[in-house]
């Protein structure tokens, strides 16, 4: 039997669509239904590698976790990863399909993307009872309606009723609801069966006159008002959210994360914020590095451009100097920057051909145009450099990188048991020399024992008692947040529209 579908759209970006889908997946999974999330087309720099070695957005990974199932590339058949010059890398069914600008994508590739979307939707519908679909941005972008691949076009394709989520925290919620509905044509508007007001703070009685009036004006019921809950700790999808999290956590241990202009997979740093005495600070142009206990250089969608940014802003020399005193850790593109040289023979990232790296690790990275490495990975810590006390410890992560790295007179960080690491033939990953280390493994700090060892090293250097390897606050908080999110929605939203769909 083919699954029933419900779709969550928003009056704007960041209205709360992703978390609403996660909540509905959790709620109906707990009620015994086989539920799967779906987002036809996502634009995000935070991605993940599935067990199929396919790349999808992290939002769909969270939603799959909420549904109690393994993530699949069919849950996000088209992923757009912004690059330079208004182009994006287009990922279809978890594999790169090329770099395209908006015009080329719409005129030459749209039909291919739509076919992939249709195929994945049918795949999920044949295997589950309920598909919870997430839209993108707003359905009322009337200049884009005929090119839509994420909102009403998908609602019609899936024959899905739509719940519209509106963010009251940013102001103008009733205008955004009325404006969205007014701008939709009758065929699209008829799909919307209810509105949810999200991120409300205060006494709901004050809101009731507005709710009654907006229902009169639009003829669409308000299904619920969801309170703002600052206690929820869930991964962010957009880099725009970084501006709201310059400082995270409180404590004596200060970890600086370089806010690269083209930062990607910044969820790599999330687990550090759950170490009880660690303060994570995003380092932007003009900030000082003087009071830090460690520096992390994260992933980037353009290693060479962001390396040049560090040089031009004086950060490169500061990092070189501080590496004598404190740990410097690079992930993916950040690891590539730590080496002596980056050779871009294929001119993938720059017309420069090659540039000098930070010179903190004796290695070179080569971009040869051979294609992207996408893999779930596992390795064992070799116990070199600052990780001498972790020898033999198993870590897991995932790889999403172009370029391979050749080591000189420097020790690798990991022996690779599954995946690729520094080269396409596997063997070893990363490098470590004294205080400096790097890896291609995204998610390495999601490994509790690795993270606790790293932060304990920082504690000991400051004369602070190290913490025991007991409770993984990050994993526990994530599970709690998903459950709490589901409870908030269940307590504050009329779910009868979905119940009727399932019973019909």
From Swiss-Prot:
Residues of the active site: 332 (nucleophile), 442
SUPFAM superfamilies membership: Class I glutamine amidotransferase-like, P-loop containing nucleoside triphosphate hydrolases
Swiss-Prot/TrEMBL keywords: Cobalamin biosynthesis, Glutamine amidotransferase
Domain GATase cobBQ-type stretches: 252-450
Keyword hit for Cytoplasm: no
Disulfide bridge partners, by residue number: none
Pathway noted in the entry: Cofactor biosynthesis; adenosylcobalamin biosynthesis
CDD domains: CobQ_N, GATase1_CobQ
Pfam families: CbiA, GATase_3
Gene3D superfamilies: 3.40.50.880, P-loop containing nucleotide triphosphate hydrolases (3.40.50.300)
Family annotation (InterPro entries): Class_I_gatase-like (IPR029062), CobQ/CobB/MinD/ParA_Nub-bd_dom (IPR002586), CobQ_GATase1 (IPR033949), CobQ_N (IPR047045), CobQ_synth (IPR004459), GATase_3 (IPR011698), P-loop_NTPase (IPR027417)
HAMAP family: CobQ
The protein's role, per its UniProt record: Catalyzes amidations at positions B, D, E, and G on adenosylcobyrinic A,C-diamide. NH(2) groups are provided by glutamine, and one molecule of ATP is hydrogenolyzed for each amidation.
Family in the record: Belongs to the CobB/CobQ family. CobQ subfamily.
PANTHER family linked to this entry: COBYRIC ACID SYNTHASE (PTHR21343:SF1), DETHIOBIOTIN SYNTHETASE (PTHR21343)
Protein name per Swiss-Prot or TrEMBL: Probable cobyric acid synthase
Native species: Methanothermobacter thermautotrophicus (strain ATCC 29096 / DSM 1053 / JCM 10044 / NBRC 100330 / Delta H) (Methanobacterium thermoautotrophicum)
């Amino acid at each position: 039997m083919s699954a029933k579908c419900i779709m969550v759209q928003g009056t704007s970006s960041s209205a709360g669509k992703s978390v609403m889908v996660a909540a509905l997946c959790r709620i109906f999974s707990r009620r015994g239904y086989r539920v799967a999330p779906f987002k036809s087309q996502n634009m995000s720099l935070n991605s993940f590698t599935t067990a199929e070695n396919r790349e999808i957005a992290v939002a769909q990974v969270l939603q799959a976790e909420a549904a109690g199932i393994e993530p699949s590339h069919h849950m996000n058949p088209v992923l757009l990863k912004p690059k330079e010059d208004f182009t994006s890398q287009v990922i279809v069914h978890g594999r790169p399909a090329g770099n395209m600008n908006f015009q080329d994508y719409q005129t030459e590739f749209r039909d291919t993307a739509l076919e992939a979307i249709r195929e994945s939707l049918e795949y999920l519908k044949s295997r589950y009872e309920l598909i919870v679909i997430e839209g993108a941005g707003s359905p009322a972008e009337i200049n884009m309606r005929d090119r839509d691949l994420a909102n009403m076009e998908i609602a019609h394709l899936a024959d899905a009723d739509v719940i519209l989520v509106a963010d009251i925290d940013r102001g103008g919620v009733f205008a955004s609801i009325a404006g969205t509905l007014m701008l939709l044509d009758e065929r699209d508007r008829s799909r919307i069966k209810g509105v949810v007001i999200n991120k409300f703070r205060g006494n709901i009685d004050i809101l009731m006159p507005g709710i009654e009036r907006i229902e009169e004006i639009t003829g669409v019921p308000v299904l619920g008002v969801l309170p703002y809950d600052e206690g929820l700790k869930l991964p962010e999808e957009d880099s725009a959210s970084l501006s709201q999290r310059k400082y995270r956590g409180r404590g004596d241990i200060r970890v600086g994360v370089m806010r690269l202009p083209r930062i990607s997979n910044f969820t790599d740093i999330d687990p550090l914020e759950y170490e009880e005495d660690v303060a994570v600070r995003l380092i932007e142009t003009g900030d000082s590095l003087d009071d830090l206990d460690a520096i992390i250089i994260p992933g980037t969608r353009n290693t060479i451009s962001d390396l040049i940014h560090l040089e031009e802003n004086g950060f490169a020399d500061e990092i070189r100097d501080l590496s004598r005193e404190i740990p410097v850790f690079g992930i993916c593109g950040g690891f590539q920057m730590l080496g002596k040289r980056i050779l871009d023979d294929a001119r993938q990232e720059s017309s420069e051909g090659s540039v000098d790296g930070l010179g903190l690790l004796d290695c070179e990275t080569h971009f040869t145009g051979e294609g992207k490495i996408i893999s779930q990975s596992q390795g064992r810590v070799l116990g070199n450099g600052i990780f001498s006390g972790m020898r033999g410890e198993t870590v897991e992560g995932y790889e999403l990188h172009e370029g391979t790295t050749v080591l000189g007179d420097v020790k690798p960080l990991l022996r690779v048991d599954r995946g690729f690491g520094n080269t396409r033939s596997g063997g070893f990953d990363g490098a470590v020399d004294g205080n400096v280390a790097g890896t291609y493994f995204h998610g390495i700090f999601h490994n509790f024992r690795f993270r606790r060892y790293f932060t304990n090293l920082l504690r000991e250097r400051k004369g602070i008692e190290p913490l025991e390897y007991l409770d993984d606050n990050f994993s526990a908080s994530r599970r709690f947040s998903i459950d709490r999110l589901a409870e908030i929605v269940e307590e504050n939203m009329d779910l009868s529209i979905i119940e009727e769909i399932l019973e019909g």
